[in-house]
Amino acid sequence: MIKTILLLLINFMLILIVNGDIWNYCDGNINPTFKINKLTLLPDPPLVGKEVTISLEGSLNEQITSGSSIFNVAFFINGGWRQLPTFHNDICKVLSCPVSAGPFTYSTSIKVPIFTPHGQYKGQLTLTDQSNRNVTCLTFQTYLK
């Protein structure tokens, strides 16, 4: 059950990040070990209640044997940003560790839950490795239809 929830959260995060090239590296994203070459989303933009395919391509400079992610998101409602819960996760619960250095690809298809609110979102994803070093840090802002 926890793994299913974690996968849904990671996939939702990827939907938000890739929608309309609205992601950027965080300010101060110093010496990231993962460089994103391409993020794609079909259809773009994603639609609530429909299936979406998310694909990621990049390059990892060092092997990852373990690590963590911190994902925070805010939703714009009633004229202001409302912070949603922050999620702390183990990278190896989503990916098979160790993750080897070199080219990296990830692709998945999911149905965007019908209960997902339409609207404007913003947030940040920070990934760290087994030594608590920066893997990458991304910010995003998007609209989910």
Swiss-Prot record:
Glycans are attached at residue 134. InterPro entries: Ig_E-set (IPR014756), ML_dom (IPR003172), NPC2-like (IPR039670). One of its GO terms (biological process) is sterol transport. Keywords: Glycoprotein, Lipid transport, Signal, Transport. Pfam families: E1_DerP2_DerF2. It comes from the Eukaryota. GO terms for molecular function: sterol binding. The keyword Transcription regulation does not apply. SMART domains: ML. Residues 1-20 form the signal peptide. Belongs to the NPC2 family. Monomer. Catalyzes the intermembrane transfer of phosphatidylglycerol and phosphatidylinositol. This is Putative phosphatidylglycerol/phosphatidylinositol transfer protein DDB_G0282179. It comes from Dictyostelium discoideum (Social amoeba).
